[in-house]
Amino acid sequence: MSDHEGASPASSAPSSPLVPVSPRSDHNAPESPSGDVADLYKDDDSPLAPRSPASPRKSPENSPVGSPVKTTKVVISSDEDSDDEGPSSKKQRAVLSDSDASDTEATTKKSRITLDSDDSDQEGDKQQKRKDLFGDDSDDDDFDRPKKQNDDLDELVKGDLEEDRGEQQRPIYDSDDDDGPSDRRGGRNFEWDFDKMLAEKKAERKRKTRRGKDGGIDIINDDDGMVAKLVEKMKHAAKSDRNANVERKPAFQKIKMLPEVKAIMLRAGIVEVLIENGFMSALSEWLAPLPDKCLPALDIRITVLKLLHNPRFWKLDRSTLKQSGLGKAVMMLYKHPNETKENKAIANKLIGEWARPIYHLDTDYSTVSRQEREERDYSRMPEKRKKKLHSREEEPDEDEAPKRPRIRDAEGLGPTKSLDLKPGDKGYINRARVPKPSTKDYVIRPEWRVSGEFKGEKKASGSKRYDQTLRDFQERTRKSKANRLVKVSLEGRNMGI
């Protein structure tokens, strides 16, 4: 039996001359639970150690004489080595094992992601068929899907690698050494009290300012807080009155607050503040019927409708009326059979003013020219009237013109149609006719020929003194005549003694 025949089976197999085994490795060492240690810690990127399952180990005896022996760093966990090694070597071994385990996990995750990408391709084919049948919401997704899938795969791989690196670094920072981060106050979620104070001040300044319609910044006064408190009180009063109505008790909370609401609505320049703080919604609750289908108090309805029928509240936009429900509340009062005639008239005018922007009608008639008035009237003219107007503008032929009796008027200025005949004229039919609405369009405004206002007849200033003297004289003579008419009794009756 030769020297080589007594060797291990690994030595008898054809060995690779590139990767020798360290002299420390002996055949009596216990096997690692994770498999072959040399294969696990072998450098994947090294050109000298290609990964091959059939590459056997080579002992130092089979290596050629004089050739340099290359060793690989292999760590074998044994009881003797663990006793001899210090804490620093244990820490290094833990870091190396975590890093190598993370590399293997990353490799398996990449393979898993590749399989998922194949499944996603199949799913993409299904989605493409579904698009061909039913269509898609946007066409841009069809062109961007392959790029998005590749980006998603790259993000998944990067995220997994970053998590693995974080897990590797976490045991080192959690040790007793002071090499870790110095932030002991909660990490990234820590926030200084000074930053909190600055954020509160910034939010307070943001509440105190608002953007105007022209893009400028308007400073809001202290009316916001007052109006907000008033709105809360108004809603609470409306709720109390509804509860009292359900319990068959007198509801007087809104009546008590009516003077306060009237005072705030009469203030100038506060309409925008009222709208922003929800005053209109509270006002609609005040005008809404009670649970027993009865209207609110008459004083509330009269006061609120008169205050709303102010030019300041005519310019409420459509969104405000819709969100607050104020338009529905006023319309309900206009259509309610128990509402008074005066309140219905005010509600009708108010609805007409609010509806003008919906029909694109201007509220200021002084700036409208004659041509604009004619165009607006023509656009609002019914189709039948337009056809008649076009037929009149066209000059009909004498043969096709309808034959109507024509006469000369009294002054002989021109012909007159039979419809314009007066009683006593030839062809006039003296009978009653059904009145019809006039289809005339009055576009010419009559001119005002009076220069100044007429206040009545004025008397001369010189006669005032004479009239005053005459009135004084008449009063004195009237008193003297009254004294003379006293009857004197000869017998001494009615005498003051």
Curated annotation (Swiss-Prot):
Residues 7-23, 47-57 have a biased composition (Low complexity). InterPro entries: RNAPII_TF_IWS1 (IPR051037), TFIIS/LEDGF_dom_sf (IPR035441), TFIIS_N (IPR017923). This is IWS1-like protein. GO terms for biological process: poly(A)+ mRNA export from nucleus. Residues 123-134, 144-160, 181-191, 370-382, 401-411 have a biased composition (Basic and acidic residues). PROSITE patterns: TFIIS_N. Residues 281-361 form the TFIIS N-terminal domain. The keyword Plastid does not apply. It is found in: Nucleus. Pfam families: Med26. Residues 1-191, 369-433 are annotated as: Disordered. Keywords: Nucleus. It comes from Caenorhabditis briggsae. GO terms for cellular component: nucleus. It comes from the Eukaryota. Belongs to the IWS1 family.
